[in-house]
Amino acid sequence: MILLVDNTIEGKGSSPREIRSALQQIEPDLRIVNEPFQNISSEFVKTLSPSHIILSGQCHPWDRYSAESLAGIFHVIRTAPQPILGVCGGQQQMALAFGAPVGLIERIAPGEGYGGAFRERGFCNVDLNSPAGDGIFGGLPETITVWESHCDEVKTLPADFNCTATNNVSDIQAMQHGSRPLFGVQFHPELFDSEHPHGRIILENFLKL
């Protein structure tokens, strides 16, 4: 069973739905429990006992999220034994949970929030730093093509994390904890197709952990 943490505010965002759809393509019988981020606590996760946890993306800037609403999921990220995959904003959430900074890639015009911000979007190339067969990138070439859609990025690696992928827009396109099964990707592996299958392989690898 997968716990899919919905990081959207009031359901405004497609990431949780797209992740669920991708997982169902890969494993049609997979049980997926979707839960809003503000409802997550260590007690909730212990009772549910999922095999894996996925943190969805979001479409609001992180300053729209209160510290109180994030406290439970932050504690889960820091302490849960299950493999955790942070997708796009989920990677940023993982970084924030460990005290690392997150911010805009670049503001290219006046505006507030994501207004006037540069957005990396579309199928883009990402270079892997991870050894072949390692973690969630097993069976992939040195350069993968994956869907990007983000204005924010992780600015500095959290303590005990390694950068496992990069490109010319964001230095930290993926990260992995040194001793726990914590993985973050800035891109959207759930948005794959027959011409761009690398995202699917990443999700398949994660489910095998």
Predicted regions and their residues:
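Conserved beta-strand elements of the Class I
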Residues: 1-3, 101
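Glycine-rich His-Gly loop
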Residues: 6-8, 55-59, 151, 187-189
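Flexible gly/pro-rich beta->alpha loop and the following alpha-helix that scaffold active-site loops
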Residues: 20-86, 98
